[in-house]
From Swiss-Prot:
InterPro entries found in the cross-reference section: ATP_synth_asu-like_sf, ATP_synth_asu_C, ATP_synth_asu_C_sf, ATP_synth_F1_a_nt-bd_dom, ATP_synth_F1_asu, ATPase_a/bsu_AS, ATPase_F1/V1/A1_a/bsu_N, ATPase_F1/V1/A1_a/bsu_N_sf
Protein name: ATP synthase subunit alpha
Quaternary structure (record): F-type ATPases have 2 components, CF(1) - the catalytic core - and CF(0) - the membrane proton channel. CF(1) has five subunits: alpha(3), beta(3), gamma(1), delta(1), epsilon(1). CF(0) has three main subunits: a(1), b(2) and c(9-12). The alpha and beta chains form an alternating ring which encloses part of the gamma chain. CF(1) is attached to CF(0) by a central stalk formed by the gamma and epsilon chains, while a peripheral stalk is formed by the delta and b chains.
Compartments reported by the entry: Cell membrane
Site, as annotated: Required for activity: 362
Protein family (similarity comment): Belongs to the ATPase alpha/beta chains family.
Pfam families associated with the record: ATP-synt_ab, ATP-synt_ab_C, ATP-synt_ab_N
Length: 502
């Protein structure tokens, strides 16, 4: 076999032409200290705050403290395999999470990796976890209702799309139940829901996912879970990952609901990280910027103007109180950031009033302008009625001789409390809510025994579906209250068929 010189020279020339003399420069440092999910490294002189860095074993970290001589890095994963002397290099990127339709129905960790065993997530869309909140000119005032399906909320403390409404209360007062019911109620509302579980037990998160699946709500929901067993950096990042995923849909003109369950645990994780990074502690040992931690997160909730697609992102942050103390540091911070709060009281919960909403301490600052007109008409006096009932109830315990007006107020108050009770995972459509509250406030329930109220409501709803579907559809579609005669006739006809308990 003969070797031809011209063929070899042509091949060599082709290879030389393809050769690229590009040089890749990596800034690499060395780990000088490691422990408790925190690493200190020197040699990364030009690293940026919030930049991703990569350790020798492939674990990622986030540069947080930029000090003279070293950098404090929070480790996003298992830190036990990293040791002193290991190399760490800059990536030049900030942290991003995957987003898009591929995540709907999935359970992911704060890094966007699936943890539900259903295979990898294929998506082209990534959003940075930190983003500047929309400015004043990019926003529009909150004017569309977000129906939770919970009578006590939709009537007393209505929530609008783009609002931030805090849900605050002791542990075991039904905070997560409100979140689940709200997600279930969005089935017909064209809303994408993101449930961020921070520091929850894995069994609790599993229970939430199964409840959503059973009620057909997982199809439009993303669950971001940073379990209690996860390292503190993941608990700190989880809410930012959730809102970054939601912003993708908001930018497309869609409506998003993000639930943070709960931010007390995120604040505790941030306190842990800050103390390990040797940042100076402040009140209750929290760092000085813990207010900014929550404000920059919650300010990203917005109702965008029409020019930007009119999308919205509604935030429902949760805060867990200790012995109903809402004047503690983190609760007062978040109350001052949000547009209102729903206060759940443990003594109400244990006395059987569920959802255990305290109407005196609960308020919605912008939701009133988003409330359905029909609901605004029928529920206008509900808050005052409840407040005066609570006051009279306290006085009536001391005396038995009550005048007729006081007695009728007490009777109405008892029925109001009963009507606002609701079973778990049973959200109500707005038309059913309007009709039962109309019946209550206009005195149609005054002659129904208190013990029969819940049964009366259930049977009324079934009767309306069978006999007055048109009336319900009208309220749901227009949001307006039909003529009084129509509703009164419907209630009166049903009352003729209702059998009171003997």
């Amino acid at each position: 076999m003969s070797i031809r010189a011209e063929e070899i020279s042509a091949l060599l020339k082709a290879r030389i032409a393809q050769y690229g003399s590009t040089m890749e420069v990596n800034e690499t440092g060395t780990v000088i200290q490691i422990g408790d999910g925190i690493a200190r490294a020197h040699g990364l002189d030009n690293v940026m705050s919030g930049e991703l860095v990569e350790f020798a074993n492939g674990t990622m970290g986030l540069a947080q403290n930029l000090e003279e001589g070293n950098v404090g890095i929070i480790i996003l994963g298992d830190y036990l395999e990293i040791k002193e002397g290991d190399s760490v290099r800059r990536t030049g990127r900030i942290m991003e999470v995957p987003t898009g339709d591929a995540l709907l129905g999935r359970v992911v960790n704060p890094l966007g990796m699936p943890i539900d065993g259903l295979g990898p997530i294929e998506t082209e869309h990534y959003n940075p976890i930190e983003r500047k909140a929309s400015g004043v000119m990019a926003r529009k005032s909150v004017h569309e209702p977000l129906q939770t399906g919970i009578k006590a909320i939709d009537a007393l403390v209505p929530i609008g799309r783009g609002q931030r409404e805090l849900i605050i209360g002791d542990r075991q007062t039904g905070k997560t139940s409100i979140a689940i019911d709200t997600i279930i109620n969005q089935k017909e509302e064209n809303m994408i829901c993101i449930y961020v579980a921070i520091g929850q037990k894995e069994s609790t998160v599993r229970g939430v996912v199964e409840t959503l699946r059973k009620n057909g709500a997982l199809d439009y929901t993303i669950v971001v879970s940073a379990a209690a067993s996860q390292p503190a950096p993941l608990l700190y990042l989880a809410p930012f990952a959730g809102v970054a995923m939601g912003e993708h849909f908001m930018d497309l003109g869609k409506h998003v609901l993000v639930i943070y369950d709960d931010l007390s645990k995120q604040a505790a994780a941030y306190r842990e990280l800050s103390l390990l990074l040797k940042r100076p502690p402040g009140r209750e040992a929290y760092p000085g910027d813990v207010f900014y931690l929550h404000s920059r997160l919650l300010e990203r909730a917005a109702k965008l103007n029409d020019g930007l697609g009119a999308g919205s992102l509604t935030a429902l942050p949760f805060i867990e109180t200790q012995a109903s103390d809402i004047s503690a540091y983190i609760p007062t911070n978040v109350i001052s950031i949000t547009d209102g709060q729903i206060f759940l009281q443990s003594d109400l919960f244990f006395s059987g009033v569920r959802p255990a909403i305290n109407p005196g301490l609960s308020v919605s600052r912008v939701g009133g302008s988003a409330q359905v007109k029909a609901m605004k008409k029928v529920a206008g006096t509900l808050r005052l009625d409840l407040a005066s009932y609570r006051e009279l109830e306290a006085f009536s315990q001391f005396g038995s001789d009550l005048d007729k007006a006081t007695q009728s107020k007490l009777n109405r108050g008892e029925r109001t409390v009963e009507v606002l009770k609701q079973d778990l995972n049973q959200p109500l459509t707005v038309d059913k809510q309007v009709i039962i509250i109309y019946a209550l406030t206009r005195g149609h329930l005054d002659d129904v025994a208190v013990s029969d109220i819940r049964r009366f409501e259930k049977e009324l709803n079934l009767w309306l579906d069978q006999n007055r579907k048109q009336l319900c559809d009208e309220i749901r579609k227009t949001g307006n209250l039909p003529a009084d005669e129509e509703i009164v006739t419907a209630i009166s006809e049903f009352k003729k068929t209702f059998q009171p308990t003997v």
